[in-house]
């Protein structure tokens, strides 16, 4: 069939015996790129190109013959997947070139870990073990030697590790920014000293025990209660001494000092006794060395509060808090602007801010690989408040169980813990801790309270 080499779309030519307009002539500039070189140059144009012109029979014949020659090219086949040589180490299927050779994922990871961790392996045979995909895990020494023999590069692993270090650099900079400034260090040391001077560590105490009701829970053991109430009174006095040593505490109004002490005293007492918990023996030790087991603590007056306190003590163990952290957490519990009835809550908040910052920096500096330890410690304050609320209720029920009256300092500091007055339905009483006119701090001190009775049981 004759052809003049024209290039036309298949829509041109005859359709059911009727001529069909050839649209290639309307848009020659659009189709020129699809035509072979010179294919349109030799085509005569017998009529002027017009939107309404009809091609001549000769032109139709030319279009018909040329349209039969256009065959759409088949789609190009997809590229063949890249095929790597088997793993040079174990002959398993390779996943690509790793550290200089074709290797499988298993050998790649083994080599990387071995180099990064400076692993030293031992062969239990003659150092000629066969390494293939079945035996590769049997001898790490020979597998590593095979990696070196086939050309795996230590430097490639180190370079890869350096790239990751650069990517992680911003995180490292954030960690390194927690440096202890002289101001923070001074605050930490003052709080640590205040804590240590008012609360000796467990290792400094000569522990002793008692056989009183050590095996069976009872509602109240009077002898244990007498001892417990005496020790509790001394602990309250030490808590007040601790507060007076905290920077800025005595600059607060007398009313706010008393409000904060009464609201947080039980929090601090519970936190302190829980740091003297011995998990192996399930005992707690008081400041004079008296060591009580769980049953004895219950019978001494803790009652239904006992298991809550011991559970909290167990939760503190993973934190491994030192004296500075315990002191700072106690100070944060005490100096807290959200307590009820404060005259200057904003001033209290400002005093608390450096304590929070000091604890955060100290904890993160001491545990650089445990960034979540600081928020975990702060969450313990919520737990302490929950236990303290139940402890304040326990003081009320104890008044009905003990013979005689409650020791005045325990009743004053613990029964009137925050929120308890609304629970009892009674208005707050005037505090016996109120200092004389002109005093700059609460009048409560060891010298002024040692003469007060510590037990009123018969």
Curated annotation (Swiss-Prot):
Query: Where would I find the NR C4-type zinc fingers in this protein?
Result: 87-107, 123-147
What SMART domains does the annotation carry?
A: HOLI (SM00430), ZnF_C4 (SM00399)
Instruction: Provide the residue span(s) of the region labelled Hinge.
Output: 153-182
Q: What range(s) does the NR LBD domain occupy?
A: 183-417
Annotated region (Modulating) at 1-86
Location comes to: Nucleus
Q: Name one GO molecular function term.
A: RNA polymerase II cis-regulatory region sequence-specific DNA binding
For this UniProt record, the keywords arranged alphabetically read as follows: DNA-binding, Metal-binding, Nucleus, Receptor, Transcription, Transcription regulation, Zinc, Zinc-finger
Task: Give the compositionally biased regions (Polar residues).
Answer: 54-68
Q: Describe tissue expression.
A: Expressed in forelimb, in the distal forelimb blastema, kidney, liver and hindlimb blastemal mesenchymal cells.
Segment Disordered: which positions?
Answer: 54-76, 417-458
Q: Bias regions of kind Low complexity — which residues?
A: 440-458
DNA-binding region in chain numbering: 87-152
Q: Name one Pfam family in it.
A: Hormone_recep
Q: Which domain of life is it from?
A: Eukaryota
UniProt function note: Receptor for retinoic acid. Retinoic acid receptors bind as heterodimers to their target response elements in response to their ligands, all-trans or 9-cis retinoic acid, and regulate gene expression in various biological processes. The rar/rxr heterodimers bind to the retinoic acid response elements (RARE) composed of tandem 5'-AGGTCA-3' sites known as DR1-DR5. Retinoic acid signaling appears to be involved in specifying proximal-distal axis in limb regeneration.
Similarity-based family = Belongs to the nuclear hormone receptor family. NR1 subfamily.
Q: How does it assemble?
A: Heterodimer; with an rxr molecule. Binds DNA preferentially as a rar/rxr heterodimer.
Domains as described in the record: Composed of three domains: a modulating N-terminal domain, a DNA-binding domain and a C-terminal ligand-binding domain. The 9aaTAD motif is a transactivation domain present in a large number of yeast and animal transcription factors.
Protein name per UniProt: Retinoic acid receptor alpha
Q: Gene encoding this chain? A: RARA
């Amino acid at each position: 069939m004759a052809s003049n080499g024209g290039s036309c779309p298949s829509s041109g030519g005859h359709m059911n015996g009727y001529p069909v307009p050839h649209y290639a002539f309307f848009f020659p500039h659009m189709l020129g790129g699809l035509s072979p070189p010179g294919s349109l140059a030799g085509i005569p144009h017998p009529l002027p190109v017009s939107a309404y012109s009809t091609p001549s029979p000769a032109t139709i014949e030319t279009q018909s013959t040329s349209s039969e020659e256009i065959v759409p090219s088949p789609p190009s086949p997809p590229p063949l997947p890249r095929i790597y040589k088997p793993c040079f180490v174990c002959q398993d299927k390779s996943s690509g070139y790793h550290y200089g050779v074709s290797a499988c994922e298993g050998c790649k990871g083994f080599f990387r870990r071995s180099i990064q961790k400076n692993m030293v392996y031992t062969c239990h045979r003659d150092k000629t073990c066969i390494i293939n995909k079945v035996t590769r895990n049997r001898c790490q020494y020979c597998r590593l030697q095979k990696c070196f023999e086939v050309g795996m590069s230590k430097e490639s692993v180190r370079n890869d590790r350096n790239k990751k270090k650069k990517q992680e650099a911003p995180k490292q900079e954030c960690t390194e920014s927690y440096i202890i400034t002289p101001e923070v260090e001074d605050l930490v040391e003052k709080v640590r000293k205040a804590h240590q001077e008012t609360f000796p560590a467990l290792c400094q105490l000569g522990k002793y025990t008692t056989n009183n009701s050590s095996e069976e829970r009872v509602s109240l053991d009077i002898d244990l209660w007498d001892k417990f109430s005496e020790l509790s009174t001394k602990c309250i006095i030490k808590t007040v001494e601790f507060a007076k040593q905290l920077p800025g505490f005595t600059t607060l109004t007398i009313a706010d000092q008393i409000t904060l002490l009464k609201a947080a005293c039980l929090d601090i007492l519970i936190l302190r006794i829980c740091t003297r918990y011995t998990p192996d023996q399930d005992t707690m030790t008081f400041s004079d060395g008296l060591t009580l087991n769980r049953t004895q603590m219950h019978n001494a007056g803790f009652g239904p509060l006992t298991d809550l306190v011991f559970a909290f003590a167990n939760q503190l163990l993973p934190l491994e808090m030192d004296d500075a952290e315990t002191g700072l957490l106690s100070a944060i519990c005490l100096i807290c602007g959200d307590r009820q009835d404060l005259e200057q809550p904003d001033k209290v908040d400002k005093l608390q801010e450096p304590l929070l910052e000091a604890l955060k920096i100290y904890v993160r500096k001491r545990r650089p690989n445990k960034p979540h330890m600081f928020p975990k410690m702060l969450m313990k304050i919520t737990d302490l408040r929950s236990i303290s609320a139940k402890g304040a209720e326990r003081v009320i029920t104890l008044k009905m169980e003990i013979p005689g009256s409650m020791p005045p300092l325990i009743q004053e500091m613990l029964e009137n813990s925050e929120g308890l007055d609304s629970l009892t339905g009674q208005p707050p009483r005037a505090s016996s801790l109120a200092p004389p006119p002109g005093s700059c701090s609460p009048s409560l001190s060891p010298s002024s309270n040692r003469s007060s009775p510590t037990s009123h049981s018969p």
